Amino acid sequence: MTQILEVTAREILDSRGNPTVEVDVYTESGAIGRAAVPSGASTGTREALELRDKKSKRYGGKGVAQAVKNVNEIIAPLIIGMDAADQAAVDLAMLDEDGTENKSKLGANAILGVSLATARAAADAFGFPLYRYLGGVAGQTLPLPMMNIINGGEHAANNLDIQEFMIIPKGAKTAAEAVRMGAEVFANLKAILKKGGHATAVGDEGGFAPDLDTNEEAFKCIMDAIKAAGYKAGKDIVLAIDAAASEFCVKGKYELKGEGKSLTTTQMIDYYEEMISKYPIVSIEDGLAEGDWDGWGEMTQRLGSIQLVGDDIFVTNPSIFRKGIEKGVGNSILVKLNQIGSLTETLQTIDLAKRYGYTTVISHRSGETEDTFISDLAVAVNAGQIKTGSLSRTDRVAKYNQLIRIEEDLGRAASFGTPFDKITDSKK
């Protein structure tokens, strides 16, 4: 029933108009699984390799024809006849065939597309929704969304150094209510920005990309939007940021060009400390550069009462993450499927986080598609948090809509907790 019968890959476009890989996996029962691979803009240097046709003129060298060819001509013959329900075996076969540490032979985009499509095909063969197939009866926690409503850094053409300014509707009782609260704040933010004479064009992840004078001005606009929407900041809605500090770390200094500041590691932590004292910030992602391990240790000691999320520093890699655990760096990990390049390795990283008390945030990438795999994954592993952009652009909203459907499907079995009650209670 779940024996793999056919594997087909193609080149499609992502939300930035760049090519990406889409894969279909068919089983002997007629089941089909389809998956599209996302792509990042601010990327960790140790991420699995996204194979692109750099020497070709097609798509300005960004094509993925070679990755597609690798699926159709190398991976397909390798896994046809295997059991789609044996995810680990399928993934291991591809990893062995690739044989490189960063998946540079076949391409992480080729391997991941097949990996995710295989899981979907198996779920379809058994007649289960994806979240149920991946998580069994235990997967029933809807994740609290971290909504990126102002974009800066590599995600927008403005002078904001911080890449993402996010709201977290921690006062919501359901996923549907969380989405509504976020949408209401987003709508009010648009009105506030318009009134202030700012552009309301959106960035890669659907958030507004105004050319504000300082990072703090972004916080002020968001606080005003929360109030205008009828909510209380710190109680109903809290704040989070993704600094993506590797992008503005130059020769060991943190260059906040928008504010004309050049800061040492300690001064950068001081900067965050000041912002935390002024605003209900409960989570900071990539507050320091990926190579600043000593700085991360200092930041964890000083700011460890809030959530400190490692993205570029951990890159969803179990071995690198284990190093961070041993050093006591951060207290949370951002999980991006394409950073490591297979579902099996992603699940290993999530399991490691749970065993060592790190929180888990399932995340999209800035270059996305309509694929909603991460919504099902977040519920399946009871991650408790998801980061999938703003309340605009179909590539972002598709994930929120899928969470609403899953919540409806779970019915009374659905739960919706928040990992931030303890943090915000201590700030009252």
Swiss-Prot record:
Q: Catalytic site residues?
A: E205 (proton donor), K336 (proton acceptor)
Sites binding (2R)-2-phosphoglycerate sit at: Q163, K336, R365, S366, K387
Looking up InterPro entries in the UniProt record yields: Enolase, Enolase-like_C_sf, Enolase-like_N, Enolase_C, Enolase_CS, Enolase_N
Q: Pathway, according to UniProt?
A: Carbohydrate degradation; glycolysis; pyruvate from D-glyceraldehyde 3-phosphate: step 4/5
**Binding-site positions, Mg(2+):** D242, E285, D311
Q: Which GO terms describe its biological process?
A: glycolytic process
Q: Which GO terms describe its cellular component?
A: cell surface; extracellular region; phosphopyruvate hydratase complex
Presence of the UniProt keyword Disulfide bond in the record: no
Keywords, A to Z, come to: Cytoplasm, Glycolysis, Lyase, Magnesium, Metal-binding, Secreted
Q: What is its EC number?
A: 4.2.1.11
Record's Gene3D superfamilies? Answer: Enolase-like C-terminal domain, Enolase-like, N-terminal domain
Cofactor stoichiometry and binding remark: Binds a second Mg(2+) ion via substrate during catalysis.
Cofactor field = Mg(2+)
Say yes or no: keyword Transcription regulation present.
Answer: no
As one GO molecular function, the record gives: phosphopyruvate hydratase activity
> What top-level branch of life does the organism fall under?
Bacteria
Q: Which reaction does it catalyse?
A: (2R)-2-phosphoglycerate = phosphoenolpyruvate + H2O
Q: What is its main location?
A: cytoplasm
Q: Where in the cell is it found?
A: Cytoplasm; Secreted; Cell surface
Identify its protein family.
Belongs to the enolase family.
- Which HAMAP family does the annotation name? Enolase (MF_00318)
What this chain does, per the entry, is described as: Catalyzes the reversible conversion of 2-phosphoglycerate (2-PG) into phosphoenolpyruvate (PEP). It is essential for the degradation of carbohydrates via glycolysis.
**Protein name according to UniProt:** Enolase
Q: What is the species listed in this Swiss-Prot or TrEMBL entry?
A: Desulfatibacillum aliphaticivorans
